Amino acid sequence: FREAFVRIWSERVVNDEFNALVLGAELSWREVVVFRAYAKYNHQVKFGFGTTYTAETLARHVHIVSLLAAYFRTRFGLEIANRQGELARLEREILSALDQVPSLNEDRVLRRFLELMNATLRTNYCQGADQDAKSYLSFKFDPAKITAMPLPRPAYEIFVYSPRME
């Protein structure tokens, strides 16, 4: 929490609704940036839900957000033992939790994060520790794995998120 507060106060991290995940889902400031970046990408490809609604949905389902964060760390972390087995276990747990979400729109928002994580081929997230983290986050996507992606779909897409570019 302290590191997130310092970064928000010093305006190195955006101060918005996504920061509720620091306390609610016990995420680090960098993990919150991952969710914010995916939400901004959703906005760019006209997914249909605004970033405020997305942030509010995430805040209402912090257990699922915690599972999604663990999924992301497992998918892209360095030196993860039994990566495929752990990803399969986490995905089953996420899908089971999603079955309990009463709102169809909230279900779509939450499933979209899992879909985007699975469509992400590469990211710079793991380059450097928290204090050495880059000021931007980049993803390389396989658009064929993203439903409702506007046509024409490129073979690959690079998305860079930075608070300085907003």
For each predicted feature, which ranges?
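Extended, well-ordered protein cores
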Residues: 1-166
